[in-house]
């Protein structure tokens, strides 16, 4: 894809003069865990965490051993409210979700260290839009979770056979407390209704 090559060239240029996150080997980590036909849920984020050691290519996820960020703590709280009795995870690595068919995709795949939103014009958005469009056309039925105005603006449209869920961003600064978000239970009900099986939202 020409826009992917453009984004990679711009990434290479910037990485020579600034620290870029996540590490290059993890930029496309979101492609490693499930085949397109096995994707059940898409959670769309904005850009990677901008502190060193956090981002590893999955939206909202951090490496093991890194403190769980406030946004992810709020996501975990919502999961527990959706499924009473669910254990609270002890870390913030969401690879288990990714292996179970949850695509954790940011609209920008890289960021300059310490500068949120700094790579929003790099060109990743066109790649992400193409990925979402192809999934919408060829996979599913799918559940799209769009948290916050940025994700909702970036998403575009999906076919009628998919379920699109919107809510405020899980950031503690958001107006609506994310703990009241029922997307996880809604997603499972939709997936089970369409014969795809719900997602196990536990993290081990």
UniProtKB/Swiss-Prot annotation:
Subcellular location: Host nucleus
Residue positions of the active site: 47
Keywords recorded for this protein, A-Z: DNA damage, DNA repair, Host nucleus, Hydrolase
Molecular function terms, GO-annotated: uracil DNA N-glycosylase activity
Gene Ontology CC terms, in alphabetical order: host cell nucleus
GO terms of biological process kind: base-excision repair, AP site formation via deaminated base removal
UniProt keyword annotation of Hydrolase present: yes
Pfam family, one: UDG
EC number per UniProt: 3.2.2.27
Protein family according to the UniProt entry: Belongs to the uracil-DNA glycosylase (UDG) superfamily. UNG family.
Stated role: Excises uracil residues from the DNA which can arise as a result of misincorporation of dUMP residues by DNA polymerase or deamination of cytosines. Therefore may reduce deleterious uracil incorporation into the viral genome, particularly in terminally differentiated cells which lack DNA repair enzymes.
HAMAP family assigned: UDG
Protein name: Uracil-DNA glycosylase
Species this chain originates from: Bovine herpesvirus 1.1 (strain Cooper) (BoHV-1)
């Amino acid at each position: 894809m020409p826009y992917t090559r453009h984004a990679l060239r711009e990434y290479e240029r910037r990485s020579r003069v600034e620290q870029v996150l996540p590490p290059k080997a993890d930029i496309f980590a979101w492609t490693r865990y499930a085949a397109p036909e096995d994707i059940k849920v898409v959670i769309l984020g904005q850009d990677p965490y901008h502190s060193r050691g956090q981002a590893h290519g999955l939206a909202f996820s951090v490496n093991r051993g890194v403190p769980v960020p406030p946004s992810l703590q709020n996501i975990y709280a919502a999961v527990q409210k959706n499924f009473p009795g669910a254990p609270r995870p002890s870390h913030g690595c969401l690879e288990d979700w990714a292996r179970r068919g949850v695509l954790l995709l940011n609209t920008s795949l890289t960021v300059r260290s310490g500068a949120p939103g700094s790579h929003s014009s790099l060109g990743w958005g066109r790649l992400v839009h193409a990925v979402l469009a192809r999934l919408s056309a060829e996979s599913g039925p799918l559940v799209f979770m769009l948290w916050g105005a940025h994700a909702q603006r970036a998403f575009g449209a999906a076919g009628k056979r998919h379920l699109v869920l919107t809510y405020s961003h899980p950031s503690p600064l958001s107006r609506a407390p994310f703990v009241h978000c029922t997307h996880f239970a809604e997603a499972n009900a939709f997936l089970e209704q369409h014969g795809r099986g719900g997602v196990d939202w536990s993290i081990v």
